[in-house]
């Protein structure tokens, strides 16, 4: 008979026991977790310290072309670019650096590689992947390095050691 089945009574009792165990366990003081969260590190290995961000360095605007530190290094921008518009529709750098404008502006011409797509096909205009100049070229600023520069290019210069 159905009224005689003892397993019907065990299920509610087991559930009540589990609930009591969970409540008592939650009320007990918890031990310190074994894993502790550490502060984030910045790229120099220092702990994350929130505070005032230092201003950018003063731009060098002498229009002197700088020597590159290694082959294939993109040249730095030796003039101010404050207010230059660089959008999908407008690139003010092209006003001076496109081949047809360099004679009048005296600016160096864009490398021919900027007119080649990824397959090596020469285009009539700057390839879209080279259109945003500041992705590779940066404005030179007068700042002290954050860390000492120990870069050695391994390239043997003619007449050098």
Swiss-Prot record:
The keyword Transcription does not apply. One of its GO terms (biological process) is anaerobic respiration. Heme c 1 binds at residues 79, 93, 96-97. GO terms for cellular component: periplasmic space. Keywords: Electron transport, Heme, Iron, Metal-binding, Periplasm, Pyrrolidone carboxylic acid, Signal, Transport. GO terms for molecular function: metal ion binding. Its main location: periplasm. Binds 2 heme C groups per subunit. The N-terminus is blocked. The keyword Protein transport does not apply. Component of the periplasmic nitrate reductase NapAB complex composed of NapA and NapB. Electron transfer subunit of the periplasmic nitrate reductase complex NapAB. Receives electrons from the membrane-anchored tetraheme c-type NapC protein and transfers these to NapA subunit, thus allowing electron flow between membrane and periplasm. Essential for periplasmic nitrate reduction with nitrate as the terminal electron acceptor. Belongs to the NapB family. This is Periplasmic nitrate reductase, electron transfer subunit. It comes from Paracoccus pantotrophus. The gene is napB.
């Amino acid at each position: 008979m159905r009224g005689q089945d003892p397993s019907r009574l065990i299920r509610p009792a087991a559930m009540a026991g589990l609930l009591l165990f969970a409540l008592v366990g939650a009320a007990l003081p918890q031990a310190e977790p074994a894993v502790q969260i550490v502060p984030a590190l910045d790229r120099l290995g220092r702990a994350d310290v929130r505070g005032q961000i230092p201003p950018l360095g003063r731009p060098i605007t002498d229009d002197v072309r700088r020597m590159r530190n290694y082959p294939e290094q993109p040249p730095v921008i030796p003039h101010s670019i404050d207010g230059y518009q660089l959008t999908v529709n407008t690139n003010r750098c092209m006003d001076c650096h496109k081949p047809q404008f360099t004679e009048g502006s005296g600016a160096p011409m864009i490398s021919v590689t900027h007119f080649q797509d990824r397959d090596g096909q020469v285009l009539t205009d700057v390839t879209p992947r080279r259109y945003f100049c500041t992705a590779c070229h940066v404005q030179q600023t007068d700042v002290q390095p954050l860390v000492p520069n120990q870069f050695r290019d391994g390239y043997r210069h003619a007449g050098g050691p």
